């Protein structure tokens, strides 16, 4: 990876207008993707605001995720606390799953190098993050968010017992334009029989960087110019070649390739930093819809086999759409440099 350039090096110091900042292409070794930074196409970093309305909250009486309406949901997998009618969170099957958990016996057919179809076996679950309809994830305290993260871990460990599953994606869609069909705060997990191509590309990119430098590029991503905040065990950064404006990554300080190795103490610590980032995003960007994704490693590869990669949590505020150029090339245009994002977000005060 090319060494991150500072604002002063690219003619975009604090005193320069956006129009005077030169465009720049950066390649991200993690995603293996080129990004065009073109500040002249946009406004000042501090002027970014969401114009997308959150999806309207239905009345609690019509929401099956609210406490007391459990019978309207798909089957429950577990709740926290266990067997408690006054639950704090529930993990349930998705009522409209993208994959079927009932096809496992058919999924044992061997996949060959020429296979173009395999049976659609997998798991698609929903994590209901609060019993109260009006509470969003950023309203929950760090311990409560830690409980949600540990619920992800517990469910990953359960699903990992199925030999046909190779990768599990944890993700959250907050707001209608971010893909949420329910306004009650929730996240989702999808367990796949294949390793998705973006995951393979991420592993290849981080491996190439490691072989070239002897270092993990995600460990290297924590340069001070890109750091927003940090906790005891995690650091939040605006990544060097951010695909999206105001994209944020939360990275463990210790090298770790699999999210489900997270312990209880680190879960609470991560919960605090995730809460802080969501609160800062909401304040600075006018409470935009957002997605977060946990990027981890395939289940069947051990920690010792992956000295070159690192799990992380990616937050993407929905501030701009994807056009024909991005779809056609896989190369994205970002109107704000991550150094500027980091500076703006560091200075956001919640008091």
From Swiss-Prot:
Pfam families: GalP_UDP_tr_C, GalP_UDP_transf. GO terms for biological process: carbohydrate metabolic process; galactose metabolic process; glucose metabolic process; positive regulation of cellular response to phosphate starvation. It catalyses: alpha-D-glucose 1-phosphate + ADP + H(+) = ADP-alpha-D-glucose + phosphate. It is an enzyme of class 2 (transferase). ADP-alpha-D-glucose binds at residues 41-44, 72-74, 94, 173, 179-182, 188, 321, 325-326. Its EC number is 2.7.7.-. It comes from the Eukaryota. The active site is at 186 (tele-amp-histidine intermediate). Zn(2+) 1 binds at residues 63, 66, 133, 184. Keywords: Carbohydrate metabolism, Glucose metabolism, Metal-binding, Nucleotidyltransferase, Transferase, Zinc. CDD domains: GalT (cd00608). Zn(2+) 2 binds at residues 216, 219, 255, 310. Binds 2 zinc ions per subunit. The keyword Repeat does not apply. Its cofactor is Zn(2+). SUPFAM superfamilies: HIT-like. Homodimer. NCBIfam families: galT_1. Catalyzes the conversion of ADP-glucose and inorganic phosphate (Pi) into glucose-1-phosphate and ADP. Does not possess galactose-1-phosphate uridylyltransferase activity. Functions by a double-displacement chemical mechanism and ping-pong kinetics through a covalent nucleotidyl-enzyme intermediate. Belongs to the galactose-1-phosphate uridylyltransferase type 1 family. This is ADP-glucose phosphorylase. The lineage of its organism: Eukaryota, Viridiplantae, Streptophyta, Embryophyta, Tracheophyta.
């Amino acid at each position: 990876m090319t060494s991150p350039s500072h604002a002063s090096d690219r003619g975009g110091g604090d005193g320069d207008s956006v129009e005077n900042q030169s465009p720049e292409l950066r390649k991200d070794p993690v995603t293996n993707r080129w990004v065009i930074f073109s500040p002249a196409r946009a406004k000042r970093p501090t002027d970014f605001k969401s114009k997308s309305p959150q999806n309207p909250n239905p009345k609690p009486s019509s929401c099956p995720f609210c406490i007391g309406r459990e019978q309207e949901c798909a089957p429950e997998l577990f709740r926290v606390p266990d067997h408690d009618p006054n639950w704090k969170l529930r993990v349930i099957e998705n009522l409209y799953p993208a994959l079927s958990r009932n096809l496992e016996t058919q999924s044992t057919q061997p996949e060959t190098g020429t296979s173009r179809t395999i049976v659609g076996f997998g798991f698609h679950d929903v994590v209901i993050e609060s019993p109260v309809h009006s509470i969003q994830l950023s309203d929950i305290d760090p311990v409560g968010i830690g409980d949600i993260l540990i619920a992800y871990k517990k469910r990953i460990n359960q699903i990992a017992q199925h030999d046909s599953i190779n990768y599990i994606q944890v993700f959250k869609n907050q707001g209608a334009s971010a893909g949420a069909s329910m306004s009650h705060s929730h996240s989702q997990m999808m367990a796949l029989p294949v390793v998705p191509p973006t995951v393979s590309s991420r592993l290849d990119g981080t491996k190439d960087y490691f072989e070239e430098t002897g270092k993990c590029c995600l460990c290297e991503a924590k340069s001070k110019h890109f750091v927003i905040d940090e906790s005891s065990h995690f650091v939040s950064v605006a990544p060097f070649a951010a695909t999206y404006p105001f994209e944020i990554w939360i990275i463990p300080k210790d090298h770790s390739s699999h999210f489900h190795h997270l312990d209880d103490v680190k879960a609470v610590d991560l919960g605090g930093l995730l809460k802080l980032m969501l609160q800062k995003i909401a304040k600075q960007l006018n409470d935009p819809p957002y997605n977060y994704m946990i990027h981890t490693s395939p289940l069947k590869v051990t920690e010792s086999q992956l000295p070159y990669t690192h799990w992380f949590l990616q937050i993407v505020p929905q501030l701009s759409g994807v056009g024909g150029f991005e779809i056609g090339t896989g190369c994205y245009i970002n109107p704000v440099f991550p150094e500027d994002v980091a500076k703006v977000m560091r200075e956001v005060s919640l008091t």
